[in-house]
From Swiss-Prot:
The keyword Calcium does not apply. Its main location: cytoplasm. The lineage of its organism: Archaea, Methanobacteriati, Methanobacteriota, Methanomada group, Methanococci. This is ATP phosphoribosyltransferase. One of its GO terms (cellular component) is cytoplasm. SUPFAM superfamilies: GlnB-like, Periplasmic binding protein-like II. It holds the Pfam family HisG. Disulfide bonds: none annotated. It comes from Methanococcus maripaludis (strain C7 / ATCC BAA-1331). Feedback inhibited by histidine. Keywords: Amino-acid biosynthesis, ATP-binding, Cytoplasm, Glycosyltransferase, Histidine biosynthesis, Magnesium, Metal-binding, Nucleotide-binding, Transferase. Its EC number is 2.4.2.17. Its cofactor is Mg(2+).
């Protein structure tokens, strides 16, 4: 049996749960319970704060978990965890920012003794030390952007996705500390246990199959027999397209193929020009 730690709230909680459900690992949640069953009796779920998950997995409280790379760095656990997968979403950057009217325009302008407010004191301190800087770190638990304007700090170190929030709060980015995405991580001892490792790999395989399918589409059509070679040349598919007879029409063939989502528009246009008809483009839930 393995215990999977998932964020109990926040921007990555919903998409992660949706991916697990598409992978076939439906979670039975009852009210505000901190633990839940899945359709697999050998996989149980624990809901926790995303910031606590790196330590829970490192310490063996959970066997595998989902968290942000920034939180792994903040808890200084990245070397102690087995990094299994980058979800490629939940993108954010931890940046140092200053008020727009500040004389600080880059990390070179930051001076020892300045105050910096952040929700990431550990990561911020280590980064500044690598830069040879000694700042007073003010730990906050939210609304970091206001700190320079109420005399709490000179700078902030905070997460940003697009930079819009910084601009709205009259702040400018002066240094990028780290880029972060959502990660699947495992306890190293659990990965050495054959039974637990096998179950963790099942979870990993399921997630990978959903993520891979998100960028693909199944395209189906009826096409003239004399155009099949031209059509199959523009939809190679995965191992080649599937071509089959249509019982009611001996001049047409049914063709199915998997293509990249970003090629759908161009491909459909080309197929129509070659005489394909009854074209269907369908989302795919999983590809194994």
């Amino acid at each position: 049996m393995i215990l999977l730690a998932l964020p109990n709230k926040g921007r990555i909680s919903k998409p992660v749960n949706e991916i697990l459900e598409k992978a076939g690992l439906k979670i039975s949640v009852h009210g505000r319970s901190l633990f839940a069953q899945t359709v697999d009796p050998e996989i149980k779920v624990m809901f926790a704060r995303a910031k606590d998950i790196p330590e829970f997995v490192r310490d063996g409280v959970a066997d595998v978990g989902v968290t942000g790379y920034d939180l792994m760095l903040e808890r200084d656990t990245e070397e102690e965890l087995e990094m299994l997968l980058d979800f490629k979403f939940g993108n954010a950057r931890l940046v140092i920012a200053a008020p727009e009217n500040s004389t600080v325009n880059s990390i070179k302008d930051v001076k020892d003794g300045m105050k910096i407010a952040t929700e990431f004191p550990g990561l911020t301190k280590r980064y500044l030390e690598k830069k040879g800087l000694n700042l007073e770190i003010i730990e906050l638990s939210g609304a970091t952007e206001i700190a320079p304007f109420i005399g709490v700090s000179d700078l902030i170190c905070d997460l940003t996705s697009t930079g819009t929030t910084l601009q709205l709060n009259r702040l400018k980015e002066v240094e990028n500390v780290v880029s972060s995405t959502t990660r699947l991580v495992a306890n190293k001892k659990s990965m050495e246990d054959p039974e637990k490792c096998a179950k963790i790999n099942q979870v990993l395989s399921g997630i990978k199959s959903v993520l891979y399918a998100q960028s693909k589409r199944l395209i189906m059509m009826n096409a003239p027999k004399d155009k099949v070679s031209e059509i199959t040349s523009i939809i190679p598919g995965m191992g080649g397209p599937t071509v089959s007879e249509i019982l009611s029409n001996d001049k047409m063939l049914a063709i199915n193929a998997v293509i990249d989502e970003n090629k759908v528009f161009e491909t459909v246009t080309n197929l129509e020009m070659l005489g394909a008809r009854d074209i269907l483009v369908v989302p795919i839930e999983r590809i194994l």
